[in-house]
A protein has these predicted regions:
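Short, low-complexity disordered leader/linker segments with a strong preference
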Residues: 1-27
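Exported/periplasmic ABC-transporter solute-binding proteins
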Residues: 19-107, 112-287
Length: 287
């Protein structure tokens, strides 16, 4: 990401990164979801072309990091790939913070494998058996495939850390609200890390935002529970709700945004802002 228009793109894995307690009156600090990190940087950069006097800094770390910063009042916008939990809302209110939710787009959580992995599709039940604690699918042979030897047949699991909105959405939709991931899952820091993990081994499988696809991985179509046809995550299937692992993407502010923050949120929801999301592989809001 080019630092051309006072837009800094910073990634961090700390729970509460320092966003700066004091900042210029027009500065916007935007922190949180790793899923939204790249597009948040692209939005900030494009907005900076129009309004270079409004510096926008963008940092990642996960949805939980964004929420923590919002509650601490150390950022103006928190990016989240999940809704705030009630306990987070309660804590925010105790701190004098009033979280206001803004839906800025939609995303399909894609299931990725190595580009040479021959798997054609998976059902939601099979995904549960692959990733879920107690699930009986441990080897690609359990799915009718052979990667060449016993070691390569062991499925390598790429997951996200538990402060990730992607982690929570996948768990709820695939494993169930009370479901747990297998302990042997590799808990990776970011969306890009999951895709790179899948690209590194023909035995690997993982889940991440659709926008992070590369030429080194394939997206596996998923068959919803009770259906027979596998569905790939696309703009159309996410908008229609037919792809089973999809979710809205949010930005949160402290109260209804006004001034430069309000203008920025409004622009993100406009056709021009939504075109940036779509170009990055996300599903735009209906206009």
């Amino acid at each position: 990401m080019k630092n051309l228009f006072a837009c800094a793109l910073i990634t961090t894995s700390a729970f509460l990164p320092s966003c700066g307690q004091s900042h210029a009156a027009t500065e916007i600090e935007n922190v949180g979801s790793d899923t939204l990190l790249e597009v948040a940087g692209a939005l900030a950069e494009k907005y900076g072309v129009m309004k270079p006097e409004v510096p926008i800094s963008v940092a990642g770390g996960g949805s939980g990091v964004g929420v923590a910063n919002l509650i601490a009042n150390t950022c103006q916008i928190a990016n989240c790939s999940r809704p705030l939990k009630q306990k987070e809302i309660d804590l925010a209110k105790k701190q004098g913070v009033d979280p206001v939710q803004h839906t800025v787009g939609y995303d399909g959580i894609a299931v990725f494998v190595h580009k040479d992995n021959p798997i054609q599709s998976l059902t939601m039940e099979q995904l549960n058996a692959i990733f879920g604690e107690g699930g009986e699918v441990e080897s690609w042979k359990d799915l009718g495939m052979d990667m060449g030897d016993d070691a390569k047949n062991v499925i390598q699991l790429g997951s996200r850390q538990n402060n990730s909105g992607t982690y929570e959405c996948f768990r709820e939709k695939v494993l169930g609200k009370k479901g747990r991931f297998k302990q042997r899952c590799n808990n990776l820091n970011g969306s890009k890390d999951v895709v790179e993990f899948c690209a590194s081994s023909k035995s690997a499988i993982g889940y991440s935002g659709l926008a992070y696809k590369t030429d080194d991985v394939r997206i596996v179509p998923i068959t919803p529970a009770g259906q027979t046809d596998a569905i790939s995550p696309t703009v159309d299937t996410v908008q229609k709700g037919t792809y089973p692992i999809a979710r809205p993407l949010f930005m949160y502010t402290n109260g209804e945004p006004t001034g430069e923050v309000g203008a920025y949120i409004k622009w993100i929801k406009s056709a021009e802002g939504q075109s940036v999301l779509e170009a990055k592989g996300y599903v735009p809001l209906p206009q």
